[in-house]
Amino acid sequence: MTRPDIPQEFKDYARRLLGAERYARFAQALDEDPSVSVRLNPFKAVWSGLLAEDLNGVDGSVPWASGEGCYLSERPPFTFDPLFHAGAYYVQEAASMFLGQILRRYVTRPVVALDLCAAPGGKSTHIRSCLPEGSLLVSNEPVKWRE
């Protein structure tokens, strides 16, 4: 049974689109608690010892995040962590960390990049950490309430 706040029309559409077996896996995933992942900031001095000493509950690395992403076994109260406020790491969905693989592979010289939907900023900080030295990133958020 999927979450009750999902409209029945969407459930029916997804079942037709995915087929019975895939829909069952999809519905099960919707009932599970979401995973928690963080991306370490490679430009911070504390980064090298961060995983071992300061982040509790590390539950594996994000395979496509070049050693910068990890899953946590539970969601800690990030707002109480001074390393979070210092920018040592960013709470970021693991799937969005895949962008780093693309940038590191195909962007090999300095570029000017534009992030048109930049709030709350996780992908912008990730993009900047992956661009070659000498690159410029302009981050923009056109939707006022997302700033």
Q: Which residue ranges define each predicted feature?
A:
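S-adenosylmethionine
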Residues: 1-147
